Structure formats: C-alpha cells, structure tokens
C-alpha cells in the first residue's frame, strides 16, 4: 500500500558536531523580517505579524480601557462610605437608657453586626445594645451571686442561733433529776419563827415557850402540831412529812378528825351544858390541863374557850380565843372564864 501524500525526509548527516552548529547545518531555521520562519531553503511556517506604524496607538487603547462610568463610580463610593461609617464607633458618649448617665463607652458590635453596637454604662455597670432589649443583669451576674450569699448567710445565722438556744437549754436544765433536792424547812412558811413566841406577851398574848422537836431531816413530829393546838385527840406521833405513806400528813389529818378549837362531842350536847375536855400536853413535860368551858345559850352560837398551854396561870384570866379564831380580850358582860 503506497501513500503518495507522505513526503520522504532525508536522514540527518552523521557528522553530529557539525549539525550542532546552526551555521553549518544546511536545514537551520531562520526568521525573516516579514515574520516567516524558514528552514534552510524550504519555508516551513509563514506568518505575517501586524506591523505597528503608530507607536502611540497602544497607549490610547489602555486609557480607554481604564475609564469608568461616572454613575457606577458614584454608587461604589457611596457604599464604601456607608460601610466605613458603620464600622466606626459612634461619636461622643451616649446616655444610659437606665440611669441617664453620660459615663458610657462603646464596647463592640454585637454578634459582629455593624447595626448592633454594644455600649457599657460605668455608673450602673450594665450593658445595652442599640435596638435591643434592656437587661437588668449587671456585669458578672452580681445579683445572682448576692442572692446566694445572702441565703447562705441567713442559713448559717439561723443554725448558729439554734445551736446557742440548745446550749442555753442544756446549761439551764439539770443533768440528772435525782440531784434536784427539795429544800425543806422544819417550820411551815406561813408560820413565824417559834423562838420569838415568848416575846409576844407584851401585846397581850402571853404565849408560852414551845419545845418543838425540829429534826434536821425535814420531818416534823405531830407534837409540834399538838403544841400549836391544831390537832386534838388521836395518835399523831408519826412524822408528818416523809416517805412513809402510813405516817404522812393525810394520815395524821385523817386520824385527827377535828381541830382543837372545836370539840369532838360538840354537836351532841346542848348549849347550856358544860363540857369537860382533856387537852393535849405541851412540851417535853406533857403537863395535862383541863379547862371547863361554859357554853351559854346564844343565838349566834359563839364559842368561848381558853387555849390550854398557851396562857400562863399567873397572867390575865380573861384572855381566850373567840369563835372566829382571833385572839382578843373578852367582855365581862358576855363571857366568863372558869378555871378548874
């Protein structure tokens, strides 16, 4: 198969050093003035470059390309001016919307938005954003911190007060109830001291000395009560106050069914009758004395009788205890005293 269109090429010469020199190479490429590339005697590429007869023509075309429409230039300048104005902080100090203080400063743009400048008030220590809602939270959340501190202080103060109250209660209350001792006195609180009873003779009472058995253990014998004339009859020799239930005060009261001022058989006799009564002894000698009581017929039922042992025989004979239990001198017109 033969291709007639394929051109045959001659092999390059064997002399390589000579072929390296373009001057010696018969097929070297040359660039002519008209812009055509020739190789040896054969023209390989023919291209005619445009010639520039006017050298100022290139500068005119560059100036025309850089020329901008005045309308578009004005729009871009306005946009750049607006952005520059928004990016700059507001001039002057703005008044705080809360306290109207001028001691404010510009901080930054909220969320990097140029339309939301954020300011800080040094007076009330709060931020505010132009166009945003006002927040009452100060810098660092001071309100919340103060609330926690106050609640903690109140709790600690209440706990300390509770501890102090409990300590005071423990200090005042006795540790053991067995250590509490009742301070008992041998004499009753409603009775005067018995040592000065003999000195009452100057006012007309003429009370004899009473030899009471005052024990140091807080027990009072029944003779002490008999000496005072409170009880008549019955065996009350046991202690009045003590741990023995059989000899306590209630037992002594039960055994003594009546007082010395009233007779046991008082309601069994008529008023004109005379009753001989045996009175209890007084003191250590236990001297028994009998007194005859004359009971007169009286509508009021007044009873006059001497108190045995409390009136000396040598003193006035008209002293007695009235029915009301009050000492006084009798009137000779109404009552008479007879001593056996």
UniProtKB/Swiss-Prot annotation:
GO terms for biological process: regulation of DNA-templated transcription. Residues 151-165 have a biased composition (Low complexity). Zn(2+) binds at residues 96, 99, 121, 124. Keywords: DNA-binding, Metal-binding, Nucleus, Transcription, Transcription regulation, Zinc, Zinc-finger. PROSITE patterns: ZF_DOF_1 (PS01361), ZF_DOF_2 (PS50884). GO terms for cellular component: nucleus. GO terms for molecular function: DNA-binding transcription factor activity; transcription cis-regulatory region binding; zinc ion binding. InterPro entries: Dof, Znf_Dof. Transcription factor that binds specifically to a 5'-AA[AG]G-3' consensus core sequence. This is Dof zinc finger protein DOF2.2. It comes from Arabidopsis thaliana.
């Amino acid at each position: 198969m033969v291709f007639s269109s394929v051109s045959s090429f001659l092999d390059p010469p064997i002399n390589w050093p000579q072929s390296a020199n373009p001057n010696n190479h018969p097929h070297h490429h040359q660039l002519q003035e008209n812009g055509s590339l020739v190789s040896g005697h054969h023209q390989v590429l023919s291209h005619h470059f445009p010639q520039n007869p006017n050298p100022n023509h290139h500068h005119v075309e560059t100036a025309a390309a850089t020329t901008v429409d005045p309308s578009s230039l004005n729009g871009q300048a306005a946009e750049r001016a607006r952005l520059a104005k928004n990016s700059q902080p507001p001039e002057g100090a703005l008044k705080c919307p809360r306290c109207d203080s001028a001691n404010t400063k510009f901080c930054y743009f909220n969320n990097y938005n140029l339309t939301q400048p954020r300011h800080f008030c040094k007076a009330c220590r709060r931020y505010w954003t132009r166009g945003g809602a006002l927040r009452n939270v100060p810098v660092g959340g001071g309100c919340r911190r103060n609330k926690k501190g106050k609640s903690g202080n109140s709790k600690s103060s209440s706990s300390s007060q509770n501890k102090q109250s409990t300590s005071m209660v423990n200090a005042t209350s006795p540790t053991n109830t067995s250590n509490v001792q009742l301070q008992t006195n041998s004499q009753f609180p409603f009775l005067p001291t018995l040592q000065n009873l003999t000195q009452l003779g100057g006012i007309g009472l003429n009370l004899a000395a009473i030899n009471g058995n005052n024990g140091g253990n807080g027990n009072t014998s029944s003779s002490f009560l008999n000496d005072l004339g409170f009880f008549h009859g019955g065996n009350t020799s046991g202690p009045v106050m003590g741990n023995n239930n059989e000899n306590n005060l209630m037992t002594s009261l039960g055994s003594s069914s009546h007082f010395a001022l009233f007779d046991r058989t008082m309601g069994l006799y008529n008023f004109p009758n005379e009753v001989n009564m045996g009175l209890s002894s007084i003191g250590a000698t236990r001297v028994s004395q009998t007194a005859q009581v004359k009971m007169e017929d009286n509508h009021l039922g007044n009873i006059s009788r001497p108190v045995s042992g409390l009136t000396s025989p040598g003193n006035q004979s008209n002293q007695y205890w009235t029915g009301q239990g009050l000492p006084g001198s009798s009137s000779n017109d109404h009552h008479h005293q007879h001593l056996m």
